[in-house]
């Protein structure tokens, strides 16, 4: 039997882990927005913890970077000082990833040895660890896609990398909440669960299309709202063959879908908040928080689009998406477990 004090240690560990993972996601956004993601062209899980420490090592790293298409085709005028700037963000992103790995492994082993963990929690944490390992490999797999003749990362791999990050955040939060509130609700709230599951499904589709928009740099085009090229539904959405490829590669279609899902999410959450009013004051507050967050996100998305995705706005847009996910997971957990 795990004591309350032991649970507090577990909750604090998961809370801290959650903060660091969210920080990792924001730094990942900055790394992408500053075009820093291909600055480190190899993957050394152990020796990669050491950055260049003197001028000779910096020149060696820069010379290695010069061998790849990003320098040859895009950054041929880059100086060593410019390179140090983009190296910093990618290095910080990678070193934080390693820190998260250690932040999981050492406390997990300690808690396991002290019998803080029941069998169900052990399984959940091992699954979480597997997701973390998968995310590490996906990050490198994504970088590799930009080290070839076309010096741009695959928007499909970026979408996978970002989606896994959001899944990890949701899962860490769910595990933490399940430790805090382990008793299931007896009251049937199935109709509310269906609604929140639908919203979560829409949310993750939106994350994918947000990654497509970012990976293909579509934020630089059609910088008006609500119209695109003077129309609500612009021409050219189905120009590619076969038809399904428009959903994956047509820049105009991808931005249109990202806009449309954003509005659809706003409406869905607004309607869902009315349902929650019937339950309790607590659920009413959760509904209002969701409406406020999604309203701010839609507004921020529009401003980011109109201003052609400047770094601060675009990174804030990604951060607010994390907040919305946490609010959704909190509401979903509250529908299933007693408070």
Question: Which residues make up each language-model segment?
Answer:
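Membrane-interface junctions at the ends of membrane-embedded or membrane-associated helices
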Residues: 4, 115-119, 174-187, 276-281, ...
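Interfacial helix-loop-helix junctions of multi-pass membrane proteins
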Residues: 31-40, 137-158, 213-223, 298-322
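Hydrophobic cores of alpha-helical transmembrane segments in multi-pass inner/ER membrane proteins
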Residues: 100-106, 162-179, 264-271, 321-336
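N-terminal signal-anchor transmembrane alpha helix
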Residues: 12-49, 202-213
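Membrane-interface helix-loop-helix junctions at transmembrane boundaries of multi-pass membrane enzymes
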Residues: 112-126, 273-290
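Membrane-interfacial catalytic/cofactor-binding modules of polytopic membrane enzymes
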Residues: 207-265, 270-274
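Individual transmembrane alpha-helix segments
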Residues: 64-102, 245-265
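Small-polar-interrupted transmembrane alpha-helices in polytopic inner-membrane proteins
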Residues: 16, 20-27, 123-143, 198-206, ...
């Amino acid at each position: 039997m795990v004591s309350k004090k032991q649970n507090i240690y577990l909750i604090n560990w998961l809370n801290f882990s959650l903060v660091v993972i969210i920080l990792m996601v924001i730094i990942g956004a900055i790394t992408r927005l500053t075009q820093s993601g291909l600055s480190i062209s190899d993957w050394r899980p152990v020796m990669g913890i050491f950055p260049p420490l003197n001028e000779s090592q910096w020149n060696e790293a820069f010379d290695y970077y010069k061998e790849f298409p990003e320098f040859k085709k895009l950054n041929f005028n880059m100086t060593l000082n410019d390179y140090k700037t983009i190296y910093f963000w990618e290095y910080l992103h990678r070193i934080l990833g390693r820190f998260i790995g250690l932040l999981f492994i050492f406390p997990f082993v300690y808690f396991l040895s002290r019998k803080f963990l029941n069998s169900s929690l052990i399984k959940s944490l091992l699954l979480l660890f597997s997701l973390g390992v998968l995310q590490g490999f996906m990050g490198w797999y994504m970088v590799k896609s930009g080290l070839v003749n076309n010096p741009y990362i695959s928007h499909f791999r970026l979408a996978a990398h970002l989606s896994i990050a959001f899944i990890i955040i949701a899962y860490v939060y769910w595990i933490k909440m399940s430790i805090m509130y382990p008793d299931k609700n007896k009251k049937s709230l199935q109709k509310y669960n269906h609604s929140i599951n639908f919203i979560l499904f829409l949310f993750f589709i939106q994350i994918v299309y947000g990654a497509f928009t970012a990976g293909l740099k579509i934020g630089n085009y059609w910088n008006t709202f609500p119209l695109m090229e003077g129309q609500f539904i612009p021409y050219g959405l189905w120009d590619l063959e076969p038809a399904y490829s428009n959903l994956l590669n047509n820049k105009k279609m991808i931005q249109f879908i990202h806009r449309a899902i954003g509005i659809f999410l706003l409406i869905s959450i607004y309607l869902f908040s009315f349902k929650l009013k019937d339950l309790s004051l607590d659920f009413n507050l959760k509904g209002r928080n969701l409406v406020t967050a999604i309203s701010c996100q839609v507004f921020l998305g529009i401003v980011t689009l109109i201003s052609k995705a400047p770094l601060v706005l675009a990174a804030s847009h990604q951060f607010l998406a994390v907040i919305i996910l946490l609010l959704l997971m909190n509401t979903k957990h509250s529908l299933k477990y007693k408070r």
